[in-house]
Amino acid sequence: MSSPVLIEIKSRYPQMNEAMRRIADYVISSESDIIYLKASDFAEKSGVSTASVSRFVKLLGYKNFNEFRLKMAVTEEKNVNEKPEEKDRLVYNGEAIGKSPYEVSKTIFSKSIRELEDTWNMMDFDILEPVANLIDRANRIVAIGVGRSKITTEALVSRLYRIGYYIVDFCDSHEIVNITSILKEGDLLIAVSNFGQSKSVVEGVKRAKRRGVTVVGITSVKDSPLAQYSDYVLFSAYDYASDKMGKLYEPSSENVAQLVLVDCL
């Protein structure tokens, strides 16, 4: 399980500029070293200015670097008793060459387990009941998502349809334009985008909002456009490794976390 600080950093990573990403990369790779560093030393090791460090910790909600470092120290103390092999099994760099089928499978399963644990730690349980009530009262329920987000929208349709709710989903950009142009007050739009930046999804949300439609967003990235425009947001854990490895690597763990969020509704 990632620490609360790392979960917060990873959830904001896609929205960070280059300097902040350097800092985030250093924190994620050298978590235990930070508690011994001064702000100037931390900036030097991260390859950024002290001003960038100040902006970074304030983005995470801390007044200054010392407060951030104290939080990291508390987290490190909690992790002292964690078994080394338990920590090692959760390290995933995408390299499968030379590993046995058992090792590869164990790594993939461990990755999904950690994504679920991190998603649990990000949960805002206070919005689950209001969102469930919106689903129950909505005149019409529409889910939108492109690419692999369609996996989540299809699961949502399957679950709600089986218990008596009429819901449809759209994954084509033109269809999203059409449906969000005719939704009206009393309807519910559920929008899914892992990074929260899919243009057709975000534009669809904005279009629906102008028509008085309530929007529930499902995303991994805080402060993303989808999160900003949604009335309610369900956050799933962000896969930092997939971002570092590029678009060719799309782990199922992110979809698993979103599917479990759907089950919670």
Question: Which functions belong to the PLM regions below?
Answer:
Residues S2-L6, Q15, S32-Y36, S40, ...:
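HTH-adjacent hinge/linker in prokaryotic transcriptional regulators
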Residues D126-A138:
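Glycine-rich phosphate/diphosphate-binding loops that line cofactor/substrate pockets in enzymes
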Residues M16-R22:
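Short helix-coil-helix linker/hinge
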Residues D136-V260, C264:
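Glycine-rich phosphate-binding loops that contact phosphosugars or nucleotide phosphates
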Residues Y26, V131-L134, I179:
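CheY-like receiver
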Residues R22-I28:
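Pre-recognition alpha-helix immediately N-terminal to the DNA-recognition helix
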